[in-house]
Design a protein with these regions (language model features):
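Long, highly charged low-complexity segments
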Residues: 160-196
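Cytoplasmic/organellar membrane-interface segments at the starts of transmembrane helices
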Residues: 152-159
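Extended two-metal-dependent nuclease catalytic cores across DNA- and RNA-processing enzymes
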Residues: 1-147
Length: 196
């Protein structure tokens, strides 16, 4: 079984929630909106990383009219070119959201396919049923990846400044070397290095 970085992030977010933490995910990937909940907030980067847009469960419902969990179904319907997920031809965000507001999930949509209005939409859904389900599966972030570490193992600790100084010096990473706090340098305050 293969997992993506999204799956690791989703699993860690879920573990954090289960341990009573408030979780914040910072990403440029809108796929993460499916992870928003009462305890998980998603910050979407804008214009590089200079602006962040905050999404929690309530904002997603207000803005899109669907729940975070339904974003998986939306991706199944409309696909995602950036992730090579095909979706159903002719179904974009607007139509996908409309269908999910009416039917809730892809599964319920197909159970009630005769109630779908719009001849072209219904025909495309029928013709591309397997693609819709495959796209949903591909778009879902897995939140139960078996991890061999705990959240405590992932805590950020004080760097090994001496080792970093050694590596940066050897590789001549002068700009990184200059960022080591002076009181952590082996030469205590001397950032003047000569390289030949």
């Amino acid at each position: 079984v293969w997992y993506e970085a999204d799956d690791i992030a989703g699993t860690l977010a879920k573990i954090g929630e289960e341990e009573g933490m408030e979780v914040t995910l910072v990403t440029g990937d809108r796929d993460y909106l499916q992870l928003a909940s009462d305890k998980t907030t998603v910050l979407i980067t804008r214009k590089g990383i200079t602006q962040l847009e905050k999404y929690d469960k309530n904002r997603i419902i207000e803005e899109y009219g669907i729940t975070p969990e339904q974003f998986i179904d939306l991706k199944g319907l409309m696909g995602d070119q950036s992730d090579n997920i095909p979706g159903v031809p002719g179904i974009g965000e607007k139509t996908g959201i409309k269908l999910l507001k009416e039917f809730g999930t892809i599964e319920n949509l197909y159970e009630n396919i005769d109630n779908v209005s719009g001849k072209k939409t219904k025909e495309s859904l029928i013709e591309h049923k397997s693609t819709a389900f495959l796209s949903k599966k591909l778009g879902e972030i897995i939140v139960n990846v078996p991890l061999d570490c705990s959240l405590d193992d992932l805590k950020v600790e004080e760097p090994d400044w001496e080792r970093l100084e050694e590596i940066y010096t050897k590789l001549e990473f002068n700009s990184l070397l200059s960022k080591i706090p002076e009181d952590k340098l082996s030469n205590k305050g001397s950032t003047n290095y000569l390289y030949f």
